[in-house]
């Protein structure tokens, strides 16, 4: 009898453990969702460096319905236009928006600028005593379209007003090396400052800071993407080892997409 009880207990435990394993299967939160992609040439479906872009791999792996608005050469000041186009074409029928922008702002020497405009003003305040007018400093987002932070502020103000219930996700610029298209489009690698004396790092850092300013998640592709075109060994991930280490090829896009696939597991796509 004792042996029978032990055997019965074993089968009950085994069945319970197997059931728990089955119920613990994770469904990717972005599976089957509708996702808009904003960006520049690396996102642009017409760019020839790669037939399949990072968003194409995510479509294959997660059955995502992709709305792609990236246009070659665009900078952060184009995001409001892409926002308006998405709103016009799909309204609120979208689950999330991913913004991958900034490398062209660096190349065009857009000044970094500031996040806030600050002023001294009057406001009502009472704590332990009757409320009264007091003098305080107040800050508001800088909306200067001639600066990088100002452009990000303008873009995210537009996005969060247009799509207040949607997930908005930012991707930092990735590392970049030489891009030699022609005599009038000859871009040096990130080891050099741009026209306004800034390294690419400053533009990456500003996108990361935007997470705190605007309450949006940021995935740091510069750090986690794994692509480092300044090394010849990493030229395999880019369009052309001699003339284009700016645009990832299909292998490069696949690596970026794999990184994004797993990082998106930590974020809800819809609310």
Where do the model's predicted regions map?
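Residues that line or immediately flank small-molecule/substrate-binding pockets and catalytic motifs
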Residues: 8, 39, 101
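Sec-dependent N-terminal signal peptides
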Residues: 4-13
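Alpha-helical transmembrane segments and their juxtamembrane interfaces
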Residues: 12-13, 50, 177
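Serine-esterase "nucleophile elbow" of acetyl-processing enzymes
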Residues: 20-72, 77-93, 97, 232-233
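Alpha-helical cap/lid subdomain in secreted, periplasmic
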Residues: 61, 83-271
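C-terminal segment of classical bacterial N-terminal signal peptides
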Residues: 13-19
């Amino acid at each position: 009898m004792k042996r029978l009880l032990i055997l019965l207990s074993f089968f009950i435990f085994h069945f319970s453990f197997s059931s728990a394993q089955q119920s613990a299967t994770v469904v990717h939160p972005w599976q089957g969702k509708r996702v808009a992609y904003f960006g520049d040439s690396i996102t642009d479906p017409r760019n020839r460096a790669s037939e399949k872009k990072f968003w194409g791999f995510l479509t294959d792996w997660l059955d995502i319905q992709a709305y792609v608005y990236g246009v070659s050469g665009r900078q952060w000041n184009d995001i409001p236009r892409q926002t308006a186009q998405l709103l016009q074409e799909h309204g609120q029928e979208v689950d999330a928006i991913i913004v991958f922008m900034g490398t062209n702002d660096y190349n065009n020497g857009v000044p970094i600028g500031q996040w806030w405009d600050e002023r001294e003003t009057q406001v009502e305040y009472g704590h332990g005593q009757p409320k009264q007018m007091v003098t305080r400093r107040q800050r508001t987002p800088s909306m200067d379209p001639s600066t990088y932070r100002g452009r990000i502020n303008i873009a995210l103000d537009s996005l969060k007003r247009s799509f207040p219930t949607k997930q908005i996700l930012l991707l930092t610029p990735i590392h970049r090396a030489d891009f030699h298209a022609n005599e009038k489009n000859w871009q040096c690698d990130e080891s050099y400052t741009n026209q306004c004396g800034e390294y690419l790092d400053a533009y990456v850092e500003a996108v990361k800071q935007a997470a705190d300013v605007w309450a949006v998640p940021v995935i740091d592709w510069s750090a986690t993407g794994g692509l480092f075109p300044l090394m010849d060994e990493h030229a395999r991930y880019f369009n052309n080892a001699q003339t284009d280490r700016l645009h990832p090829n299909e292998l490069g896009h696949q690596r970026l997409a794999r990184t994004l696939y797993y990082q998106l597991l930590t974020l809800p796509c819809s609310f």
